[in-house]
């Protein structure tokens, strides 16, 4: 449109060939390139561009969220997977580190405070303890599995015992947890839909085993092109963040 106003006509095929040459043949790739320019060059966006980026990548909506290093702020959410024959309803507890998108995921047959705490105890804390990192804060919505009466609610007690600050999203605005929203969208598209087409699962354990394999690839092999990772895998960003964390803690000492 702009070129036409200037009296220039460009063949759509020419535009397409340029996109292919620059690895920008899809709208998603073009948005990723735009996102990278924002953080690399300080590019100012129009309102429409911001809306498109936030729709393509919910994490972008959280671009002003401070996350200085691994463990600084994690996000947790419950995702309804569906029904498994002979088992019933399946729920996924998902936890994502906002510094680099390192993620954890575990399946349950219920949506309760016990399961919300279990993934932290079983998967999340052991990982950070192995790296000698403290989890400083976790962000959740206001679901009953996460919020309740102090000193009675199991999840709240678990966080208190482990000296983890509990932050919550604004009431009636569940989309303010963009990091975990992006992860659950990815796990639905790249794992669950494919897994259920290829295989008939008869137990939660069987599905969890395949999920663990997918998650290993997600964290260690899959490049993340979002603004925080810039093409690195979550574990690569995590390891780089450990160095940054140590430097920041030394400066603060």
Q: Which residue ranges define each predicted feature?
A:
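Intrinsically disordered, low-complexity segments enriched in polar/charged small residues
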Residues: 21, 32-38, 69, 111, ...
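Basic, flexible linker segments flanking DNA-binding modules
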Residues: 1-72, 144, 152-159, 231-243
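Residue-level marker of positions within ordered structural domains that often coincide
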Residues: 4, 20, 106, 192, ...
């Amino acid at each position: 449109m702009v070129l036409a106003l200037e009296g220039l006509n460009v063949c759509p095929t020419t535009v397409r060939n340029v996109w292919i040459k620059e690895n920008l043949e899809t709208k998603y790739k073009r948005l990723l390139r735009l996102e990278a320019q924002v953080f690399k060059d300080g590019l100012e966006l129009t309102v429409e561009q911001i809306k498109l980026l936030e729709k393509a990548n919910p994490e972008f909506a959280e671009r002003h969220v401070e996350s200085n290093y691994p463990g600084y702020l994690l996000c947790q959410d419950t995702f309804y997977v569906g029904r498994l024959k002979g088992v019933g309803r399946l729920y996924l507890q998902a936890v994502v580190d906002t510094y680099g998108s390192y993620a954890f995921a575990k399946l349950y047959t219920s949506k309760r405070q016990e399961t919300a705490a279990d993934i932290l105890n079983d998967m999340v804390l052991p990982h950070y303890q192995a790296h000698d990192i403290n989890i400083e804060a976790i962000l959740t919505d206001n679901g009953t599995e996460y919020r309740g009466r102090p000193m009675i609610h199991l999840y709240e007690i678990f966080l208190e015992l482990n000296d983890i600050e509990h932050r919550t999203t604004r009431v009636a605005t569940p989309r303010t947890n963009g990091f975990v929203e992006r992860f659950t969208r990815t796990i639905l598209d790249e794992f669950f839909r494919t897994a259920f087409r290829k295989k008939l699962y008869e137990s939660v354990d069987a599905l969890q085993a395949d999920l663990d394999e997918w998650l290993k690839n997600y964290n260690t092999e899959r490049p993340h092109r979002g603004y925080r990772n810039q093409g690195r895998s979550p574990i690569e960003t995590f390891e780089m963040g450990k160095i940054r964390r140590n430097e920041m803690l030394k400066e603060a000492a």
